[in-house]
Regions:
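Conserved functional loop/turn residues at catalytic and ligand-binding sites
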Residues: 27, 36, 49, 72, ...
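Gly/Ser/Thr-rich beta-alpha loop segments that engage phosphate groups in nucleotides
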Residues: 8, 33, 37, 84, ...
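PIN-domain endoribonuclease scaffold, especially VapC-family toxins
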Residues: 42-51, 56-62
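Active-site neighborhood of HAD-like aspartate-dependent phosphohydrolases
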Residues: 1-29
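Substrate-recognition element of Asp-dependent hydrolases with the DxDx(T/V) motif
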Residues: 20-44, 55, 91
Length: 139
């Protein structure tokens, strides 16, 4: 849908939001690198406690590398989720690359984990829950 001002409206899954907030509250750092331009999405993510948000990204690997340098991380310490061709370089660069069930075939082929959930339908929750369960940090 498009708003009266011509802005593309997006929905966000409440369960995804809970999982992101829960992860942040438990010491995980979440960053967003998106080609999108929706400031309402940015506001929602800020409200969840995400402050590393890069919109209008045309070359995501640049922001990926900036985040790694900023926080003194190695590629192996990063988990990335993506669903389309522009995400492939960062999926391949990360220690773990994930995608939703409805990602394009090229992304699925590059990913280490394909969620059974579609994007916007609890995929982020699925991935965060899997990681936190493995680390004995889930509820």
């Amino acid at each position: 849908m498009i708003s009266e001002t011509g802005e593309l409206l997006r929905t966000m899954n409440v369960k995804d939001g809970f999982a992101m907030k829960f992860a942040i509250d438990n010491g995980y750092k979440i960053g967003i690198i998106s080609g999108g331009t929706n400031e309402a999405v940015k506001k929602r993510l800020n409200n969840l406690g995400i402050d590393e948000i890069h919109l209008r990204s045309h070359d995501k690997i640049i922001h990926f590398n900036d985040i790694i340098k900023k926080y003194g991380l190695s590629n192996e310490e990063i988990l990335v989720m993506g669903d389309d061709v522009p995400d492939i370089p960062i999926i391949k660069a990360a220690g773990v690359g994930c995608c939703p069930q409805d990602a394009v075939p090229e992304v699925k082929a590059a990913a280490n984990y394909v969620s059974q959930k579609n994007g916007g339908d609890g995929c982020v929750r699925d991935v965060i829950e899997q990681v936190m369960k493995i680390q004995n940090k889930w509820i």
